[in-house]
UniProtKB/Swiss-Prot annotation:
Keyword flag Metal-binding: no
Record localization: Cell membrane
MF GO annotations: ATP binding; protein kinase activity; protein serine kinase activity; protein serine/threonine kinase activity
Gene3D superfamilies: Phosphorylase Kinase, domain 1, Tetratricopeptide repeat domain, Transferase(Phosphotransferase) domain 1
Organism expressing this protein natively: Arabidopsis thaliana (Mouse-ear cress)
Entry keywords, A to Z: ATP-binding, Brassinosteroid signaling pathway, Cell membrane, Coiled coil, Kinase, Lipoprotein, Membrane, Myristate, Nucleotide-binding, Phosphoprotein, Plant defense, Serine/threonine-protein kinase, Transferase
Positions of region (Disordered): 8-48
Lipid bilayer topology: Lipid-anchor
Result of changing residue 443 to Q: In bsk1-1; enhances susceptibility to fungal and bacterial pathogens
Family of the protein in this entry: Belongs to the protein kinase superfamily. Ser/Thr protein kinase family.
GO-annotated cellular components: plant-type vacuole; plasma membrane; plasmodesma
The organism's taxonomic lineage, starting at the top: Eukaryota, Viridiplantae, Streptophyta, Embryophyta, Tracheophyta
Active site: 198 (proton acceptor)
The reaction(s) this protein catalyses: L-seryl-[protein] + ATP = O-phospho-L-seryl-[protein] + ADP + H(+); L-threonyl-[protein] + ATP = O-phospho-L-threonyl-[protein] + ADP + H(+)
Protein's name according to its UniProt entry: Serine/threonine-protein kinase BSK1
């Protein structure tokens, strides 16, 4: 391709690395959506999955769990762009811990060999990056094959580029999208997963912060022997048409088509775009809604990069590190959050305070003041356990004495703020199972929060609620854990429920 300088003038075995599947009851998953075009899906919805520490570990789900999460795979929950016509449907779902997920359901017998599907899923599930909508689980149940990913609540790049209602994506945000997706591809390549199937604007999703993420679903084929590209042949890498194989260079070609989408705001065939580039008709290529709102120098760089990505010969295309290096210097508004540039509302950092007055514990939870919560739980001691753990005379065995000693050591560590030791001691008490204490679950939940383990904290707070369904503290602790997991709408709901329960107690309920 000619220079664009003056164009504007006219296999992974299960259990490897010690990773073992965990049952759902031991691993509260959460998160946001992952799209799949043909089926690609961007979902609108609440919830989020945040990056980094909020990502749950990869594990196996039962089909019953996913069926419940998606309301029996209701058509109302389909988020694939092609709806029910897509060969592999993507649903949004909600787990028992109130976190949103995206579930990709493959057609029957798409992957007949369960071990092969599981190994592929585990390979992708090891990837963890805030530029990806991460894979958090899978399901192999009979003939059923499903993938479970973080749910991205703010739609796809295709929706924002091709079907926008209030505002199109501004130029700086388009540059950010290209850069972030290049970073995602480079990360996957560095981690030994360089192949991405059918990269297009439907595979780019926006999280709760408005940041672009690359769908993890494209890191696996739609079937064991199936096609890797479901889009129009006009957008397919030429070598794939010849031999049906996806290579890292094929991924670069597809990235070039995404750059064309960002430049033009339309889904135009690469051959047509290249004709315009050769003829130096770049103004016709650019999105008319960006007129007067973009830098011609920056656009020239992107056009040149796109033309390099779309070279007919794979060896002439840039690699992922070249993509990142070219796009990085164009990031001129790095101080402006993505949600501002997208024109979407940012979720609050902490749950909003309900209208009704809050108790000291409620106030501490609304502020996410873990130190104050600790002081209150120490003072409350075990008052709320009355009636939940009565024992018969026969149950007073040596085992019981050992169990209560473990709780006593846990209480001492809790008072002394040795939270890791408190977790160990409370776990000994809980594991015996003869005596169930909501307070122990509540205290261990706070310990997990103070040790930066919000998933485990949420699980314990939910267990406390199971033991004592009307206990405000259980709801308060859930609200803090949910807020730590960036699930702020759910956190606010929990805070309100806790306040309502406290109000009932003050009117004559069980003593606090």
């Amino acid at each position: 391709m000619g220079c664009c300088q003056s164009l504007f003038s006219g296999d992974n075995p299960l259990g490897k690395d010690g990773v073992q599947p965990q049952p759902l009851s031991q691993n509260n998953h959460g998160g946001a959506t992952t799209a799949d075009n043909g089926g690609s899906g961007g979902a609108s919805g609440v919830g989020g999955g945040g990056g980094g520490g909020g990502i749950p570990s990869f594990s196996e789900f039962s089909f019953a769990d996913l069926k419940a999460a998606t309301n029996n795979f209701s058509s109302d929950n389909i988020v694939s762009e092609s709806g029910e016509k897509a060969p592999n449907l993507v649903y949004k779902g909600r787990l028992q811990n109130r976190r949103w997920i995206a579930v990709k359901k493959f057609t029957k017998m798409a992957w007949p060999e369960p071990k092969q599907f599981a190994e592929e899923a585990w390979g992708v599930g090891k990837l963890r990056h805030n530029r990806l909508a991460n894979l958090i689980g899978y399901c192999c149940d009979g003939d059923e094959r499903l993938l479970v990913a973080e749910f991205m609540p703010n739609d796809t790049l295709a929706k924002h580029l091709f079907h926008w209602e209030n505002q199109t994506i501004e130029w700086a945000m388009r540059l950010r999208v290209g850069y972030y997706i290049a970073e995602a591809l480079d990360y996957c390549s560095t981690e030994g997963r360089p192949l991405y199937h059918d990269l297009n604007a439907y595979r780019v999703l926006f999280d709760e912060d408005g940041d672009p993420r690359l769908s993890c679903f494209g890191l696996m084929k739609n079937s064991r022997d199936g096609k890797s590209y479901s889009t129009n042949l006009a957008y397919t890498p030429p070598e794939y048409l010849r031999n049906g194989r996806v290579t890292p260079e094929s991924v670069t070609y597809s990235f070039g088509t995404v750059l064309l989408d960002l430049l033009s705001g339309k889904h135009i065939p690469p051959s047509h775009a290249l004709d315009m580039i050769r003829g130096k008709n770049i103004i016709l290529l650019m999105d008319s809604h960006l007129e007067g709102k973009f830098s011609t120098e920056e656009a020239t760089v992107v056009v040149e990069l796109a033309s390099q990505c779309l070279q007919y010969e794979p060896r002439e295309r840039p690699n992922t590190k070249d993509l990142v290096a070219t796009l990085a210097p164009l990031q001129t508004k790095s101080d402006v959050p993505s949600y501002v540039m997208l024109g979407i509302k940012k979720q609050e950092e902490a749950p909003s305070t309900p209208q009704r007055p809050l108790s000291p514990l409620g106030e501490a939870c609304s502020r996410m003041d873990l130190t104050a919560i600790h002081q209150i739980l120490v003072m409350t001691h075990y008052r709320d356990d009355e009636g939940t753990n009565e024992l018969s005379f026969q149950e007073w065995t040596q085992q019981m004495k050992d169990m209560l000693d473990a709780r006593k050591r846990g209480d001492q560590s809790f008072r002394e703020k040795d939270f890791k030791t408190a977790i160990d001691c409370y776990s000994q008490f809980i594991d015996v199972g003869t005596m169930v204490s909501p307070t122990v679950f509540g205290r261990r939940s706070l310990c997990y929060l103070l040790c930066d383990q919000p998933d485990a904290a949420l699980r314990d707070a939910m267990q406390a609620q199971c033991v004592y369904p009307d206990w405000p503290t259980a709801f308060y602790m859930q609200s803090v854990a949910l807020a730590k997991l960036n699930m702020n709408t759910d956190a606010a709901d929990m805070l309100n429920e806790a306040a309502q329960l406290e109000e009932k107690r003050q009117r004559g309920g069980r003593g606090s």
